[in-house]
Amino acid sequence: MTITGIIAEFNPFHNGHKYLLDQAEGLKIVAMSGNFMQRGEPAIVDKWTRAQMALENGADLVVELPFLVSVQAADFFGQGAVDILDRLGIDSLVFGTEEVRDYQKIADLYTEKGAEMEKFVENLPDSLSYPQKTQAMWKEFAGLDFSGNTPNHVLALAYAKAVAGRNIKLHPIQRQGAGYHSVNKDVDFASATALRQHQKDQDFLERFMPSVALFEQASKVIWEDYFPLLRYQILSNPDLTTIYQVNQEMAVRIKEAIKTAQSVEELVELVTTKRYTKARVRRLLSYILVQARESNLPEAIHVLGFTEKGRQHLKSLKGQVSLVSRIGKEPWDAMTQKADQIYQLGKPSIAEQNFGRVPIRIETN
């Protein structure tokens, strides 16, 4: 049987995600971000709610990406997620993209010329942002031209790099309906961005979200809920360079900007430069919020939920892969667990995220 991997955030889960799961074949394993997103923001609803949405709509097994995989630039995000899915035995990776290209050919190119390509990136001027450097590399070696307005395509290229040299086939699915950042309401498939913006519009949610009741019952948060906490972390920390990935230049800019910024968005605007994109600045602010430090990724994989089919697959992996299904006295990943505790501070109604929680079981799918 085919074992298909899907890398996702489901922030929140919508019809486009259901379409992606419907297109996938065989046993469907989702590696999903926890409570903080790749572009440096808290998830609108918590990881357990999003895992349940996925399991109710076609996923067989949902595992969690650790914080230091979730909140990363595309390449590291893709690499970390593919590593986890590879250990769970996937033979194909399905993903949505705005531009369906021959990603398999791109992966083969990277297998062959990866070292040369990375050297090319290293020699590019530091005045370029990381995404600009990556784009220059793909243009040089694969003749690819694209704008930064196609985040799924950028991630797809990161997945192509990550599967290079592994026995995993790539299956791109053309993105349906609205673009990634679109807030348009007159489409067949709405984007996650639009759903976050129109979260109080009942009719809109019912049109575009398959598990709408779960979403409505869950506590919802936005970055602004954490602004007082973020401000406190910035003001009380004498040396921000002790935080993961914060350099001297960024530390100075952030310390200066917090004196006048009245919101997270304003802070991001003030700190962003040509070289440091908004997404990168948001990631740095997420690291500061949770006091992230460089740490090793966990050996074990945290299981958030499964169907009967997913349970059988986990059984077949026993002894080969280290799995965690209940976080108790023994931590799974201290960094992720700390981030989750801080996530809970966003709303008093958010349930405990780790201690004593067991995987969600869905009998049929």
From Swiss-Prot:
Molecular function GO terms recorded: ATP binding; ligase activity, forming carbon-nitrogen bonds; tRNA binding
GO cellular component: cytoplasm
EC number assigned by the record: 6.3.4.-
Chain sites annotated for binding ATP: 7-20, 96, 152, 175
A matching Pfam family: HIGH_NTase1
Reaction equations catalysed: cytidine(34) in elongator tRNA(Met) + acetate + ATP = N(4)-acetylcytidine(34) in elongator tRNA(Met) + AMP + diphosphate
Enzyme class, first EC level, given as a word: ligase
This protein's record includes keyword tRNA-binding: yes
Organism domain of life: Bacteria
Record's signal peptide: none
Keyword Oxidoreductase carried by entry: no
Cell location: Cytoplasm
Keyword list, A-Z: ATP-binding, Cytoplasm, Ligase, Nucleotide-binding, RNA-binding, tRNA processing, tRNA-binding
Similarity-based family: Belongs to the TmcAL family.
Purpose: Catalyzes the formation of N(4)-acetylcytidine (ac(4)C) at the wobble position of elongator tRNA(Met), using acetate and ATP as substrates. First activates an acetate ion to form acetyladenylate (Ac-AMP) and then transfers the acetyl group to tRNA to form ac(4)C34.
Protein name (Swiss-Prot/TrEMBL): tRNA(Met) cytidine acetate ligase
Gene name as annotated: tmcAL
